[in-house]
């Protein structure tokens, strides 16, 4: 075919030999496998991958209409990229081996003549002790064989090795025997245990009461002299409404006397004044009648038998004829109230314990 001048000017080439027909992937891989040089293999595969990527970019616009074409192109590109990576790894390994060989050759060439002398001396030593060298080499080989052999052998008279028997796992423990007791029977047993503990608590209760009685007996009993000192301190301080337990105790100067004892004695003294007020015409100061303190202490001496320090006294006048009797009644009433309060507290404690036991049974 003859080209015209216009074709030559426009740079048109009508030679069809330049354009080669596309090859299938299997044929391309067969041709690449025949190439011995890794560098040329990589260049061929890179060129083929570039053509596939160009094709994919062209049909990317029509990927919805041509989904299978896109899938095939992507698979071929991924496969060829994996092949390129494998070839590059082989090339790196070859280069590292070549470099190591070159260094070894350089070291061998640079060895001085002194190495030969040391080699000769070591050779003489080796000749002098040949048995020890053989023994050491044999021991090393045996150790290697033992370490490489994953199975352990047993030594028998015939020098034959057999596998070690597998250890059987221990048998599981037998199941616990089933109890024939019903839940109701278990609850009854728990209830009986609770009752036993409750009876035990009741038996121990009198001991606590006796301990409480002993405490009452150990408390202070107020004598006539102690009453006199108490009333004298009240008169000095200005009466029971003004005086404080600490001030009274400091003025009394009695060994072993505490503020609590003086406080309880003062409270009962004030209570007695409220219950039995004296007529103003009959009231006299303690300075007018010197025997007032003696009569006051005698009339209130019976009140010293209560739980806390007591024996209330009138500070500013005389008592009537029934003062001692009324003070004894007050003492009895207070003792009864304390006993009732102790009994109520113990009953409440028992009730709360019973309620807790019932709740535990229900849970």
Curated annotation (Swiss-Prot):
One of its GO terms (cellular component) is cytosol. Keywords: Cytoplasm, DNA-binding, Flowering, Nucleus, Transcription, Transcription regulation. Residues 196-223, 273-363 are annotated as: Disordered. PROSITE patterns: HTH_MYB. This is Transcription factor HHO5. Pfam families: Myb_DNA-binding (PF00249). Residues 328-340 have a biased composition (Acidic residues). Expressed in roots, inflorescence apex, floral primordia, stamen primordia, carpel primordia and ovules. Interacts with ULT1. Residues 245-270 bind DNA. NCBIfam families: myb_SHAQKYF. The gene is HHO5. Disulfide bonds: none annotated. PANTHER family: MYB FAMILY TRANSCRIPTION FACTOR, TRANSCRIPTION FACTOR HHO5. Residues 214-274 form the HTH myb-type domain. Its main location: nucleus. It comes from Arabidopsis thaliana (Mouse-ear cress). One of its GO terms (biological process) is floral organ formation. InterPro entries: Homeodomain-like_sf (IPR009057), HRS1-like (IPR044787), Myb_dom (IPR017930), Myb_dom_plants (IPR006447), SANT/Myb (IPR001005). Disruption phenotype: Increased number of sepals and petals in flowers. Loss of organ boundary and identity, producing fused sepals, petaloid stamens and branching stamens fused along the filament. GO terms for molecular function: DNA-binding transcription factor activity; transcription cis-regulatory region binding. Residues 341-363 have a biased composition (Basic and acidic residues). SUPFAM superfamilies: Homeodomain-like. It is found in: Nucleus; Cytoplasm, Cytosol. The lineage of its organism: Eukaryota, Viridiplantae, Streptophyta, Embryophyta, Tracheophyta.
């Amino acid at each position: 075919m003859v080209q015209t001048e216009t074709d030559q000017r426009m740079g048109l080439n009508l030679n069809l030999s330049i354009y080669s027909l596309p090859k299938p992937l299997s044929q391309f891989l067969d041709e690449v496998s025949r190439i011995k040089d890794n560098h040329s293999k990589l260049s061929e595969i890179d060129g083929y991958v570039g053509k596939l990527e160009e094709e994919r970019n062209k049909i990317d616009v029509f990927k919805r209409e041509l989904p299978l074409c896109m899938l095939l192109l992507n698979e071929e590109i991924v496969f060829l990229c994996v092949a390129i990576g494998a070839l590059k790894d082989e090339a790196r390994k070859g280069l590292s081996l070549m470099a190591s060989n070159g260094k070894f050759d350089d070291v061998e060439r640079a060895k001085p003549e002194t190495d030969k002398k040391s080699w000769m001396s070591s050779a003489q030593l080796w000749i002098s002790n040949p048995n020890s060298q053989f023994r050491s080499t044999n021991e090393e080989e045996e150790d290697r064989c033992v370490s490489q052999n994953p199975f352990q052998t047993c030594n028998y008279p015939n020098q034959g090795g057999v596998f070690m028997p597998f250890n059987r796992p221990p048998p599981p423990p037998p199941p616990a025997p089933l109890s024939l007791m019903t839940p109701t029977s278990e609850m009854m047993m728990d209830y009986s245990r609770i009752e036993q503990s409750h009876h035990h608590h009741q038996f121990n209760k009198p001991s606590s009461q006796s301990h409480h009685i002993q405490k009452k007996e150990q408390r202070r009993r107020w004598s006539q002299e102690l009453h006199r000192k108490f009333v004298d301190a009240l008169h000095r301080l200005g009466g029971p409404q003004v005086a404080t337990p600490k001030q009274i105790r400091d003025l009394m100067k009695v060994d072993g006397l505490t503020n609590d004892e003086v406080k309880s004695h003062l409270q009962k003294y004030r209570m007695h004044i409220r219950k039995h007020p004296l007529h103003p015409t009959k009231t006299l100061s303690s300075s007018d009648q010197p025997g007032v303190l003696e009569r006051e202490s005698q009339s209130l001496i019976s009140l010293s038998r209560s739980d806390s320090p007591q024996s209330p006294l009138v500070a500013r006048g005389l008592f009537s004829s029934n003062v001692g009797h009324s003070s004894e009644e007050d003492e009895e009433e207070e003792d009864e109230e304390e006993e009732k309060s102790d009994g109520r507290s113990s009953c409440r404690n028992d009730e709360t314990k019973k309620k807790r036991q019932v709740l535990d049974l229900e849970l």
